[in-house]
């Protein structure tokens, strides 16, 4: 039988009566990600999602890469389906995992019977297949605690599946089950990470970027669009709302005290973000603010900017160290783009900030 991808569902299996809604969203998200890689059959059964190629020209490697970035999945494996027979599973293990079995020094076999009508217990099946493999491959020694290779046998309703060590999935919840938010994407390290973290909790995103030409360059805008593209494999399709911001900044420079410039600018950003949110049906605003990281990100400054909107402000990186944020940025492949030397509107036009602004002062 053909090679397929098995995906283990995450916390969505605990959603009770809402579980079907979560699973349907996950399947829809998977199908959209797979469109570029060929025709696949995608369905869920028994806490597992199956991705089955429907033609020889399907790009299974590309499909695998896409599924590693699918929120809602905690583990995934490339597997070979076979008949629900102990000898068929043994033969499939030899054919499908033979090279890895020949290269390993220690191994074990783990079996799972979702189909309880199968005539052997899970332990009996593991002992049978493990014993036969141990005899066939003299290089192998059984190690049930710390094996170099684990062979998994899954007996399900319509077929059995053989695979080796699964890889971790993206975790989280399917994008879209938690509603919609607008995320302020500046071009720095923090805002893409904040967007990724919120998408991981099932929130669909629309991005807002404030563009201050000629103080910021076309390259700076392109950098932000590139960051959005890098987030797309995780977050799904993203719309970037590019907001001309030069006139507001110039007016603030003329009329407001220098020490209040940054906090007033951010209050305008929140008002505009709220207007965008209302137009696209979003229920929250996401920022990459990190408490104490810069002078404009104190608790008092955050309170002053939050006061102008009735929407909740989600700050997923607010309590993280910079090293933690950078580690995630490297993982999601946004770091190298974020550090390109193009200024955003906050750094290109700025003054010394008041670190403890009050609501009355602004």
Write out the residue ranges for each language-model feature.
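Active-site adenylate/phosphate-handling loop in enzymes that bind or generate adenylated species
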Residues: 128-133, 139, 166-178, 245, ...
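A conserved beta-strand->alpha-helix junction
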Residues: 228-254, 344
């Amino acid at each position: 039988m053909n090679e397929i991808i098995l995906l283990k569902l995450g916390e969505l299996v605990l959603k009770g009566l809402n579980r079907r809604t979560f699973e349907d969203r996950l399947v829809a998200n998977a199908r959209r990600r797979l469109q570029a890689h060929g025709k696949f059959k995608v369905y869920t059964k028994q806490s597992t999602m199956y991705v089955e190629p429907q033609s020889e020209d399907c790009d299974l490697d590309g499909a695998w890469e896409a599924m590693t970035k699918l929120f809602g999945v905690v583990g995934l494996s490339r597997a070979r389906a076979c008949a629900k027979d102990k000898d068929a599973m043994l033969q499939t293990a030899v054919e499908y995992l033979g090279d890895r079995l020949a290269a390993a020094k220690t191994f074990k076999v783990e079996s799972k019977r979702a189909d309880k009508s199968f005539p052997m217990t899970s332990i009996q099946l593991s002992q049978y297949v493990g014993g036969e493999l141990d005899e066939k491959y003299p290089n192998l020694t059984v190690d049930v605690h710390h094996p170099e290779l684990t062979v998994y046998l899954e007996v399900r309703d319509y077929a059995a599946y053989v695979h080796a060590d699964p890889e971790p999935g993206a975790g989280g919840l399917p994008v879209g089950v938690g509603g919609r938010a607008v995320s302020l994407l500046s071009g720095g390290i923090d805002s893409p990470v904040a967007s990724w973290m919120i998408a991981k909790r099932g929130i669909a995103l629309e991005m807002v970027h404030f563009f201050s030409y000629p103080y910021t360059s076309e390259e700076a805008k392109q950098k932000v669009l590139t960051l959005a593209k890098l987030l797309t494999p995780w977050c799904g399709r993203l719309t970037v709302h590019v907001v001309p911001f030069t006139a507001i900044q110039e007016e603030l420079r003329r009329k407001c005290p220098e020490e209040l410039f940054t906090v007033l600018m951010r209050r305008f950003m929140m008002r505009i973000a709220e207007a965008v949110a209302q137009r696209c049906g979003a229920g929250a605003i996401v920022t990459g603010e990190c408490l104490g990281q810069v002078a404009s990100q104190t608790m008092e400054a955050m309170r002053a900017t939050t006061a102008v909107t009735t929407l909740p402000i989600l700050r997923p990186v607010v309590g993280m160290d910079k090293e933690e944020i950078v580690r995630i940025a490297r993982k999601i492949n946004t770091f190298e783009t974020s550090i390109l030397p193009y200024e955003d509107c906050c750094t290109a036009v700025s003054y010394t900030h008041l670190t403890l602004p009050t609501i009355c002062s602004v």
